[in-house]
Amino acid sequence: MENEKNYRPNVAAIVLSSSYPFECKIFIARRSDMDNIWQFPQGGIDKGESVKNALFRELKEEIGTDEVEIIAEYPEWLSYDFPSKIVKKMYPYDGQIQKYFLVRLKHGATININTKHPEFDDYQFVSVKQIFEMINHFKKNIYVRVIKYFEEKGYI
């Protein structure tokens, strides 16, 4: 995981509703600290923490539940640079290098974005097409790449 730029190791989740595979609706949430920015749950991997442990911890912290099952894992780490307007806020990092997982909410799991440190102020379960219409610009290429991969593999 060596990189020339200083990328923050990060895990991201594409969360499918519990009705998957009968209906393919994907969780997307609006960030509370930015204007109309919608994204998937994601967060940093702590030193010494496994990627999967970080996945479950971040889901619990951001959406109030870690009651998910892993459907698939994107085979590569993907990186992106922070846009200039937020790079100072994220110092010393230039961007993030991410591992993506496709997960399904377990039946009976409840989303709660009103967590101890809320990162989101709204969420929806939407179609793949709607995801592409809602996502913010600097992550769009990665979202398209990951979703297309999971589509090509027959998961969504």
Swiss-Prot record:
Instruction: List UniProt keywords, sorted A-Z.
Output: Hydrolase
> What family, per the record?
Belongs to the Nudix hydrolase family. RppH subfamily.
Which residue intervals define the domain Nudix hydrolase in the entry?
6-148
Write down the PANTHER family for this protein, in alphabetical order: ADP-RIBOSE PYROPHOSPHATASE, DIHYDRONEOPTERIN TRIPHOSPHATE DIPHOSPHATASE
Q: Which InterPro entries match?
A: Nudix_hydrolase, NUDIX_hydrolase-like_dom_sf, NUDIX_hydrolase_CS, NUDIX_hydrolase_dom, RppH
This entry's Gene Ontology molecular function terms read: pyrophosphatase activity
Q: What is the lineage of its organism?
A: Bacteria, Pseudomonadati, Campylobacterota, Epsilonproteobacteria, Campylobacterales
Q: What PROSITE patterns does the record tag this protein with?
A: NUDIX (PS51462), NUDIX_BOX (PS00893)
Question: Which gene specifies this protein's sequence?
Answer: rppH
Species assigned in the record = Campylobacter jejuni subsp. jejuni serotype O:2 (strain ATCC 700819 / NCTC 11168)
Q: Which Pfam families match?
A: NUDIX (PF00293)
Q: Which SUPFAM superfamilies match?
A: Nudix
Q: What is its EC number?
A: 3.6.1.-
Name the job this protein performs.
Accelerates the degradation of transcripts by removing pyrophosphate from the 5'-end of triphosphorylated RNA, leading to a more labile monophosphorylated state that can stimulate subsequent ribonuclease cleavage.
- The residues forming the signal peptide are none
Top-level taxonomic group: Bacteria
**Necessary cofactors:** a divalent metal cation
Write out the residue ranges of the motif Nudix box: 43-64
Q: Which residues form a coiled coil?
A: none
Q: Would the keyword Hydrolase be found if you checked this record's keyword annotation? A: yes
**Keyword Hydrolase listed:** yes
The name this protein carries in UniProt is RNA pyrophosphohydrolase
